């Protein structure tokens, strides 16, 4: 599940990829064939390992080039604005609920979220500065030019919801 493969791919190819993953990785297969899971180390650490590809919506394709070197996504032009669309997901509803519940109920001191994506934005140019917002209050929040890559940037609404959940539930560490 990489190089542009997502939940809209050929079902047989996706099933074959999942089967190959389970055959190659030293993990126990559960009845749901899910690859997201948690690993505990006593009462000290719980690592929540995410599957950011199997359930994801298609990535937002690049629509710009930055400095002639990098493919980029300009959020002011199609299809870049899709990055902010409500409901876009990389986790899927069941996994997101599992993650929220796991964060809320674990008794581990340290909670680690393992994601194959960078959680931090890869923003090259910021269009949401105080100066620009003063000129145009209707600017897209977090608008800008982002590096085009497999990242949480393509799923900003879901990332925002997850971060708000962590904050509102006072999830520490």
Model-derived features: positions:
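Long, structured stretches of catalytic cores involved in phosphate-ester chemistry, encompassing
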Residues: 1-173
């Amino acid at each position: 599940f990489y190089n542009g493969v997502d939940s809209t791919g050929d079902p047989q190819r996706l099933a074959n990829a999942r089967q190959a993953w389970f055959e190659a990785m030293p993990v126990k297969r559960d009845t749901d064939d899910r690859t997201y899971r948690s690993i505990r180390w006593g009462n000290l650490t719980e690592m929540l390992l995410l599957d950011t590809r199997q359930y994801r919506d298609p990535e937002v394709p690049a629509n710009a080039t930055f400095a002639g070197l990098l493919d980029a996504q300009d959020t002011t032009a199609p299809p870049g604005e899709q990055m902010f669309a409500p409901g876009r997901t990389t986790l899927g509803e069941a996994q997101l609920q599992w993650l929220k519940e796991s964060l809320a109920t674990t008794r581990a001191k340290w909670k680690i979220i393992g994601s194959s994506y960078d959680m931090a934005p890869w923003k090259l140019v910021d269009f949401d500065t105080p100066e620009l917002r003063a000129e145009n209050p209707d600017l897209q929040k977090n608008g800008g030019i982002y590096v085009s890559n497999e990242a949480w940037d393509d799923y900003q609404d879901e990332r925002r919801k997850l971060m708000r959940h962590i904050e509102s539930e006072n999830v520490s560490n």
